[in-house]
């Protein structure tokens, strides 16, 4: 069998299409875990998930188990969840508060900063046993941007700022209503899994073409709700709802965005009070507090932007008030974790509205999440058909624009999918030395292999 390094990704990723084996081939999945998740920056969690000393939450970087914990000094640590003795995990609870981590196999005990502090019958190891060198291993590089914690398993490489690039502006927008410390991630996590490749969720989250089809009933209900503002200003919203517009953006480094903001602020000629007050009687009070905290100009800009809808390569999606994390499990299985966020300074009433809006689209009994999962599994199943092994991602290719270092297209264009795949191929081909006939696994070779499996 040819080595994974011999896969010819140039033959599998074209400008306007990608080969279905990229969603189905286990060897390609293994290669992704090494070249993308084990080498680059990966989003791990938000500091708001572990607000107190001793708070922890289990995470993964690729397939590797990690504990995110706030240690006894108040620092957030990323520790590998693996005892240094015989390799058992030292923490099984998904989240909680602890003073230490104790391996249930032989009782080795570690402090929250990873230091090995207890070894039963330590004298049997002899005088050369160096307890201070056997703490839990730490993720080599950890960096924080506005409360978003990223880890890299490589000790050297690009900085987090270099990796994020222009996507930092979208993180700024996500927390723009607040300081980083004011973002709370304490409402739990909604998890679901689907039988499909992780990249299906990445592509779909930035797909502006499908909502009017897949989510038609929810979209109509949302439009009815937004445009039904029971005030004398109703006609202004109806008349100006054409302010709804959007586009797709490729920032580079695999970070892409669906910019389909409703622009209600502009539709109301700069006065959002009628719409805000219609949502909740306390809406105007929160609007006044926002202006007081940020000043009129910054508050106006945030209201005008109306939130972000961004994919940060390879596993973080920011949509509205929600952080969504993709966790690959295998070539045909993925777990998705959704974290709704609250703001400390908002009234409980408005924070409750934030949660209800999350549940309406993404909850287990909601419209949106189940719709998307069904599509992912249908696409994965369809990839088993070998008669036509290509997925088309060329929509809008003829008309995309290069502006200010970005690639921009219309809202339903596949600029975002192309941006993800462009960076994916770059990472998968870096350092490749395979060349020549017989050394690279080409489209034809993979097709033959897939046929043989049948």
Residues of each region from the PLM?
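C-terminal catalytic domain of Rieske-type non-heme iron oxygenases
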Residues: 70, 75, 140-454
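Short, contiguous pre-domain boundary segments
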Residues: 6-22
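Non-catalytic, topology-defining segments of multipass membrane proteins
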Residues: 1-4, 14, 452
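Short, flexible segments with low predicted structural confidence
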Residues: 2-8, 171-174
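Rieske [2Fe-2S] iron-sulfur-binding domain
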Residues: 49-169
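Short Pro/Gly-enriched beta-strand edge/turn motifs at strand-loop
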Residues: 38-51, 121-125, 304-311
């Amino acid at each position: 069998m040819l080595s994974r390094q011999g896969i010819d990704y140039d033959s599998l990723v074209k400008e306007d299409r990608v080969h279905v084996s990229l969603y189905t081939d286990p060897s390609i999945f293994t290669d992704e875990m090494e070249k993308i998740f084990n080498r680059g920056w990966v989003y791990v969690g938000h500091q708001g998930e572990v607000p107190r000393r001793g708070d922890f939450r289990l995470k993964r970087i690729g397939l590797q188990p990690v504990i995110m914990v706030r240690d006894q000094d108040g620092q957030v640590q990323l520790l590998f969840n693996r005892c240094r003795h015989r390799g058992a995990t030292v923490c099984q609870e998904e989240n909680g508060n602890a003073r230490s981590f104790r391996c249930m196999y032989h009782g080795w005990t570690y402090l929250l900063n990873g230091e090995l502090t207890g070894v039963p019958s330590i004298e049997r190891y002899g005088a050369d046993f160096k307890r201070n060198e056997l703490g839990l291993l730490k993720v080599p590089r950890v960096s924080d941007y506005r409360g978003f914690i990223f880890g890299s398993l490589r000790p050297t490489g690009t900085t987090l700022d270099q990796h994020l690039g222009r996507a930092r502006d979208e993180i700024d927008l996500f927390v723009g209503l607040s300081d980083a410390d004011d973002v709370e991630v304490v409402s739990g996590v909604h998890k679901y899994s689907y039988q499909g490749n992780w990249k299906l969720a990445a592509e779909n989250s930035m797909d502006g073409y499908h909502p009017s089809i897949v989510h038609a009933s929810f979209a109509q209900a949302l439009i009815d709700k937004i445009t039904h503002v029971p005030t004398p200003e109703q006609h202004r919203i109806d008349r100006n709802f054409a302010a709804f517009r959007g586009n797709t953006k490729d920032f580079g480094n695999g970070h892409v965005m669906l910019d389909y903001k409703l622009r209600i602020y502009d539709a109301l000629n700069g006065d959002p009070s009628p719409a805000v007050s219609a949502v909740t009687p306390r809406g105007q009070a929160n609007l006044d507090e926002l202006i007081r905290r940020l000043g009129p100009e910054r508050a106006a800009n945030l209201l005008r932007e109306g939130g972000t809808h961004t994919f940060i390569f390879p596993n973080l999606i920011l949509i509205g008030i929600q952080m969504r994390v993709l966790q690959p499990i295998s070539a045909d299985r993925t777990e998705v974790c959704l974290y709704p966020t609250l703001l400390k300074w908002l009234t409980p009433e408005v924070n409750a509205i934030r949660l209800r809006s999350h549940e309406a689209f993404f909850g287990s009994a909601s419209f949106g999440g189940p719709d998307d999962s069904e599509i992912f599994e249908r696409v994965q199943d369809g990839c088993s058909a070998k008669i036509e092994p290509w997925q088309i991602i060329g929509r809008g290719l003829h008309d995309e624009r290069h502006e200010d270092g970005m690639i921009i297209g219309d809202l339903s264009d596949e600029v975002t999918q192309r941006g993800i795949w462009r960076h994916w191929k770059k990472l998968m081909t870096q350092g490749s030395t395979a060349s020549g006939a017989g050394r690279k696994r080409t489209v034809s070779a993979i097709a033959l292999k897939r046929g043989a499996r049948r």
